[in-house]
Design a protein with these regions (language model features):
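N-terminal helix-turn-helix DNA-binding core of bacterial DNA-binding proteins
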Residues: 2-42
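Short, hydrophobic-biased segments on the C-terminal half of alpha helices
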Residues: 44-49
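Short alpha-helical
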Residues: 50-51, 79
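Beta-hairpin "wing" of winged helix-turn-helix
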Residues: 53-67, 72
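Accessory beta->alpha helical hairpin/"wing" motif in late/C-terminal subdomains of nucleic-acid enzymes
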Residues: 73-78
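Amphipathic alpha-helical dimerization/coiled-coil segments
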Residues: 79-97
Length: 97
């Protein structure tokens, strides 16, 4: 699979995982596990890329005496999910014709 394509799909998977509620790294991996196996290093690389692309924001909250990083999707991140859905629909239409 093309590296850029794979990266794009993984980015959207992570965005979808935090689409409905803010989350933190371990929970994202746990929530995605039934659908997709992902290492922590891969996830944190994706989260950093999405943060730099302004598709999510990061904030910290204290939990059991330690700071935990939470991730929240932005409007750009929501737009990326919608773009991906449209791209998928176009691909399915092309295959059907």
């Amino acid at each position: 699979m093309d590296t850029h394509l794979k990266r794009g799909i993984l980015d959207v998977c992570v965005l979808r995982a935090i689409q409905n509620e803010d989350s933190y790294g371990y929970k994202i991996i746990k929530d995605m596990k039934p659908y997709l196996e992902m290492s922590e290093s891969t996830l944190y690389t994706i989260l950093k890329r999405l943060e730099l692309s302004k598709m999510l924001i990061v904030y910290s909250i204290e939990h059991n005496g330690r700071l935990r990083k939470y991730y929240r999707i932005t409007k750009l991140g929501l737009n990326r999910i919608e773009e991906f859905k449209k791209e998928e629909a176009m691909t399915k239409c092309k295959k059907a014709s």
